Amino acid sequence: KEIENGVELNYISEDGEENYPGQLDVKVTYTLKENSLVINYKATTNKTTICNLTNHTYFNLNGYGNILQHQVQILADYFTENNQESIPTGKIIPVENTPMDFRNPQYIEKDINNEYYQIKYAKGFDNNWVLNNYNGEIRKIATAYSELSGIELEVSTDLPGIQFYSGN
């Protein structure tokens, strides 16, 4: 349904759907506020169950072509290692001295073809970065910038990690 400056989407997952226990009532709102897109999730259930809501929005700040000239910064000293099937191994690895280090703005194209095993597995970037200074409060954790368009995307969250995918 339409709400002021946005839209609210609702979904009910009935008890047993996808073999998960409990009825899960989900509400997602997308709101435009002062040049920002705010996405809020709310879910309630009547039984103990697993719920891991996420967003798979992809941005090309140029408006066309590829994203290799985008500059990305991720405020994270560590990332989660993946196996060859892109499944997390549980191992947390420092970004320092690896092509996974986006603590300072880097062009995506700089290391997208690097021989580093994590990049080779995914044919680009597709990992979770473990964010610095996690305290459960909303804070700025990443930026992407296009010199071509002059558009900068700021990402904020109250969660401990971010998945960065380069459209491999």
Spans of features found by a protein language model:
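An exposed, glycine/acidic-rich loop-and-rim segment of catalytic or binding clefts
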Residues: 1-168
